Design a protein with these regions (language model features):
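Short hydrophobic alpha-helices and adjacent helix-cap/hinge residues
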Residues: 1-247
């Protein structure tokens, strides 16, 4: 219908402070803002806080309650976790066009994407995204992990490096990266020592010690560094700026 007002909804798997998400959200909003018959909205799933099924369901219900009177015509899903909403999307909003931007061309049960998930959950429960094409109207854009290229560059630029420290929070993809990075270093750079520093309140001082120590034998490989801490009123607060204290 010519001239019909359309709604675009961006569902971000992460929080609004995540640089990767904002690098995608901002251009979309800039492109759509001059178009009079399109309204673009953004909702953040805040995956850092989602550690169990109860929290996931609260988040899911919150999204669909918020947009029950302004159903989207198009969807952009940022991060593979957002694609776990696909059945609810199909049920409540219909088989609308979806653009999924993610790191993996696979899908898994929602518990696979929970923050701090058990380490024993393996990639064996993932399946190819292509299997879902007959059921859902989606286009997938992959933003692959670049850990191999980054490590190779670090080795070239830091010839004295003997240890690589992977500093990252408990988001599911960092658990995957931990395994992938460790395997890559073991196979290609067996003389390098590998350490994993998990982003949480207990390791805040350790992170600062690494960053303040000008040690050419240690290389820092960063991913996301977000974690939850309760404020004075007992409500969860997202901590995101630890590295900025000394960077």
């Amino acid at each position: 219908i010519v001239g019909k007002h359309r709604r675009l909804l961006i569902i971000n798997s992460y929080n609004e402070s995540a640089p990767w998400s904002q690098e995608l959200i901002t251009p979309i909003l800039l492109q759509t803002s001059p178009i009079e018959d399109i309204t673009a909205d953004v909702v953040h799933m805040n995956g850092t806080f989602i550690r169990n099924d109860s929290l996931y369901i609260r988040m899911e219900n919150g999204i669909f309650e918020r947009f029950q009177d302004k159903k989207p015509d198009y969807l952009v899903l940022l991060g593979n976790m957002a694609f776990t909403l696909r059945e609810r999307i199909l049920s409540e909003w219909g088989n609308i066009p979806i653009v999924l931007v993610g790191n993996e061309d696979t899908y898994a049960p929602r518990e696979y994407y929970f923050t701090g998930r058990p380490i024993h959950i393996s990639n064996a429960i993932t399946s190819p995204l292509v299997d879902l094409r007959p059921q859902y109207n989606f286009t997938f854009i992959e933003t692959p992990y670049m850990y191999k290229e980054t490590i190779d560059m670090m080795v070239q630029m830091l010839p004295k490096m003997k240890t690589i420290v992977f500093a990252a929070d408990e988001l599911y993809h960092n658990q995957d990266l931990d395994r992938l990075i460790h395997a890559y270093i073991t196979s290609k750079y067996p003389n390098l020592h590998y350490e994993r520093l998990i982003g949480n309140e207990r390791n805040q001082n350790e992170l600062q010690a690494y960053l303040l120590n000008d040690e050419p034998e240690t290389g820092m490989l960063f991913s996301t560094w977000f974690y939850e801490r309760k404020n004075l009123l007992g409500f969860p607060t997202l901590i995101s700026g630890d590295f900025q204290l000394v960077a």
